[in-house]
């Protein structure tokens, strides 16, 4: 990010960082418009439910939390909205952001102002790898995607195919933002460490409108397995054009994004997405004995929004926000020292949250207990197939 985009007056921002009323204002910074609006809005819904539940129990430090929205339609807008939330709205902290690019950009502004930034869904490495003191991430990150994908490929997918995983020809394709490049980099590393055969690694613009040449490249490489990191529009485009081009690999594995969305399956057709895999945050067709509180969240979501959750991103944001807000309720103030004290004390074991994973923030303010799950599209629904403790179905082969 260019330095001139974030050159701010530190004093001016810090002067505006204290709440101006008895209520505690918190920023809700997501892409509410533009190409990422669907998942941005879905993520924000989880935060909103968490805040409602916290407020119903007395709020945080005796005060109600009030969310102030910021529309991070792109990276520059994320910077501008972060400035506004801090210096005009006087927020005590910012929650976000779904998009890695937006999170990286906006969190620099927040760090400069000394205002905590709580990331609940973006996965790029650099969000918590830059040594920033006031940036925390509750969710899994890019490395976790890649590790789970390669593990599932070796332990579940290859055996189901009746193949040795080392005999498979694997292609890595990804949109070229921070999200795609971070996940792909780790996929390449884990594939190499496992001794697997990567025959192609290729990026593409996230806003591309034609992937037919990429489909031809995959065919030419003889790829048996395709690992795609993508948002919704490029997930839909690839699946459609692969189908139209008669390209049917033995397995397609998505890394969240569009592969976790019911609207993606509906757009391409359930027969087209059938048997495609997805590694992502916890989704809803899961063994709920491993995810206590998930069913209650779904009911709260339906009551508030009049429909079932559109993706597990709402659940991820809900669980992360509740853990953070409950921790902040145990300290006084929202300065850097108070936030560090609160989140350093968080210690939740796996199997105790609606996500299934636990919470403990490491030296980089990353939740080191966050983990992914493996899903597969079956009969138009995304169901959990890995790990075994969370699975509700065996994996299927494409017809």
Curated annotation (Swiss-Prot):
Keyword Transcription regulation in record: no
InterPro entries from the UniProt entry: BCAA_transport (IPR051010), Leu-bd (IPR028081), Leu_Ile_Val-bd (IPR000709), Peripla_BP_I (IPR028082)
Pfam families: Peripla_BP_6
Signal peptide (residue range): 1-22
Matching SUPFAM superfamilies: Periplasmic binding protein-like I (SSF53822)
Alphabetical keyword list: Amino-acid transport, Signal, Transport
Assigned protein family: Belongs to the leucine-binding protein family.
Name assigned to this protein: Leu/Ile/Val-binding protein homolog 7
């Amino acid at each position: 990010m260019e330095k001139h985009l974030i050159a701010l007056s530190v004093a001016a921002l810090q002067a505006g960082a204290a709440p101006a009323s008895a209520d505690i204002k918190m920023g809700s910074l997501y892409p509410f418009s533009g190409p990422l609006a669907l998942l941005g809005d879905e993520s924000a819904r989880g935060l909103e439910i968490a805040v409602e539940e916290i407020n119903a129990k007395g709020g945080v430090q005796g005060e109600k939390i009030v969310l102030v929205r910021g529309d991070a339609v792109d990276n520059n807008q994320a910077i501008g909205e972060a400035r506004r939330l801090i210096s005009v709205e006087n927020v005590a902290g910012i929650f976000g952001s779904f998009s890695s690019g937006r999170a990286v950009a906006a969190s620099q502004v927040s760090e400069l102002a000394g205002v905590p930034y709580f990331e609940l869904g973006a996965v790029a490495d650099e969000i918590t790898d830059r040594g920033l003191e006031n940036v925390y991430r509750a969710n899994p990150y890019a490395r976790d995607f890649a590790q789970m994908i390669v593990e599932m490929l070796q332990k579940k997918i290859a055996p189901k195919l009746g193949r040795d995983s080392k005999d498979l020809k694997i292609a890595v394709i990804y949109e070229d933002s921070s999200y795609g490049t971070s996940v792909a980099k780790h996929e390449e590393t884990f594939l190499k460490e496992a001794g697997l055969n990567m025959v192609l690694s290729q990026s593409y613009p996230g806003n591309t409108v034609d992937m037919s040449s990429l489909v031809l490249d995959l065919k030419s490489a003889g790829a048996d397995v395709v690992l795609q990191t993508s948002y919704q529009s490029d997930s839909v485009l690839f699946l459609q054009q692969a189908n139209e081009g008669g390209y049917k690999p033995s397995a397609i594995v998505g890394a969240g994004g569009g592969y976790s969305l019911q609207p993606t399956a509906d757009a391409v057709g359930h027969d087209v997405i059938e048997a495609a895999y997805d590694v992502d945050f916890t989704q809803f067709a899961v063994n709920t004995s491993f995810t206590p509180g998930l069913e209650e969240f779904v009911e709260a979501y339906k009551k508030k929004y009049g429909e079932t959750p559109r993706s597990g991103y709402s659940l991820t944001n809900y669980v992360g926000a509740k853990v953070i807000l409950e921790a902040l309720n145990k300290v006084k103030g929202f300065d850097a020292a108070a936030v560090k004290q609160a989140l350093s004390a968080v210690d939740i074991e796996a199997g105790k949250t609606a996500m299934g994973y636990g919470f403990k923030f490491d030296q980089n303010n990353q939740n080191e207990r966050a983990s992914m799950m493996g899903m597969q599209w079956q009969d138009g629904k995304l169901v959990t197939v890995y790990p075994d403790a969370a699975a509700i179905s065996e994996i299927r082969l494409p017809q």
